Amino acid sequence: MVLAFVLVNCEMRVEKAVIDELKTFDAVKEAIGTFGVYDILVKLEADSDHKLRDVITQKIRKMDKVRTTTTLMIIQEWE
């Protein structure tokens, strides 16, 4: 499994609607509102980095109310 966190900035006062839509995507395991620089923290999990990339670029970044995203890919193992 490939894991990533996406930090989302969205338009003002639409955070709940964006979170609700994010939760409809299969790869999204959690979507929560935050205070600070970013509005939403999204935890994603997929079978491959290609599938994860597709969700981020073709779904999340193309949402009408999403302004910007920052993606953090997780290192699976340290040896």
Task: Report each predicted region and the residues it spans.
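A compositional/biophysical signature of low hydrophobicity enriched in polar/charged and small residues
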Residues: M1-E79
